[in-house]
Structure formats: structure tokens, C-alpha cells
Amino acid sequence: PSSIREIRFFTNLDKGFRFPALFIYLGSLIYWFIGNCFTRPPKLLSKKSINHLEPVVNTEKSIGGIEYSDAYLVEHDTRFVFQFIRRSLKAGCAAANYIESLGSEQQEDKTWLTKVRDTQTGKEWKVRSKIVINACGPFVDFQNSLSQQKGKHRHVFSKGIHLVVPRLTEVERVLTFFADDGRLFFAIPMGNRTVIGTTDNRVTEPETEVTDEDRRFVMENINKRVNLKQPLEEKDILSERWG
């Protein structure tokens, strides 16, 4: 519980959106009840309220919005993963970095032999275990093929990117919009930075990178939806996150 904290999401809705603000508000109420009403209740916001609470939001085409609560990682994702590994080590687990699996094979006694390789030295050896858990994310199918495991389903890949820029607002609140193509679009506070995104594009391979088109999409959409003294430009990008 100490790893997460409540944070408010602030959603602005523009004219022409596919649902009225009241409909979205009712959805947020259902979401709140599913969470046993543990957080602060959602609010239905007028255009005037949005201007008062978050003047950085462009309300020129606004029909109102909602404010609701969700949770976020206090330590952010990188530190969270590191702490997870540290706790696992204390519990008796063994963790190995830069080690890749070359496939697993089940033996006659029902145990598994997994061939692994140190990617820094090239050394290879085998590890015996009672079970093998394939938690390779987008590389699950590839790992299954190395182990001659077949299933009914295959992964379909979608790429999302975020851009990290200087902090846009002083309030610890996630700004939520709907981009030009209708997808959810966030401006997330993270320390003295703001993380903006995301895109959602179908790709054929899990290895991805940020393209000029990705940057242009994010920049155009955020500049339309916030009132800044100077519109964000590519030179304002401090770092990029994608996957």
C-alpha cells in the first residue's frame, strides 16, 4: 500500500465528443463503486469550474468535464521494479541480469531444463526447475517457439510513446484529454517533469522506436489542449519513453 498513492484525474470534454459529460460522469461513479468508494468521489465539472481549477486547460470548445481518482506509483516504474527485485532477493530468490533464455525442454521426470546464455560473456549453461513461467511480455510468442510450445493465440503488437517535458502545471493532477483521433491522451506529473502521451499504433514487431510522426502527433495534440505562454516544441523534449 505504501507504494501507491491517490491522484486526481482531470478530464476535459470538447464539443462533438461521442458521449455527453453526464454519461462519462456516470461511468466514473461506477468505477468509484467498483473500488468500494475508497477514494474521493468523482465530480462533474462545468466549463467555469475547469477554468477556475486548471486555467492551463484550453476550454474554448469545452462542454465540461469530470474529476475522479485513481492510483499511481509513488516511486515510479523504474524504482518500483528495482524494489520488487530487492524484496525477492531477501525472500530467497535469485536474480540474474543480462541472461537470456535459449529455450526450455521438459524432461521425462516432468522437470524442465532451460538453456541460458550470459549476453556479456557468451557463456552458456542449463538450469533445472520444476516449472517455467514465461513472463516475457511482447516476447512470449518468441520464447514459446524456442521451447516448442504452441497455443491457440498469438500476440498483436501496439506501440505507445510518451514524451517527457518540463512541468506544465503546479497542481499534482493528471490532465486527461481525448486526442484528435478519439484516444485517451494524458499529461502526467512526474517530479518536476510532465509525461505526455500516448500514441497507439499497430506494429508488426515488438522492437520499436519514437518516430518524427509520433512526436508531431503528441506535440500537436497537447498544444491544442493547454494554454501555455509558448507552445511546446521538439527542443522542449527532455527524454522519450516507448514500448
Model-derived features with residue positions:
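Dinucleotide-binding Rossmann-like beta1-alpha1 core, especially the glycine-rich loop
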Residues: 1-53
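A conserved short coil-to-beta-strand element within the FAD-binding core of flavoproteins
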Residues: 97-113
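Conserved Rossmann-fold dehydrogenase catalytic segment
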Residues: 7, 11, 15-18, 61-71, ...
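Active-site substrate-recognition segment that forms the wall
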Residues: 3-8, 103, 126-130, 134-243
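Helix-loop-beta segment of a Rossmann-like dinucleotide-binding subdomain
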Residues: 51-91, 95, 113, 126-127, ...
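Short, hydrophobic/aromatic-rich segments at coil-to-beta transitions
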Residues: 110-115, 171-173
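Flavin (primarily FAD) cofactor-binding/catalytic cores of flavoenzymes
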Residues: 87, 99, 118, 224
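A structured beta-alpha segment of the ubiquitous adenosine-cofactor-binding alpha/beta core
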Residues: 115-126, 130
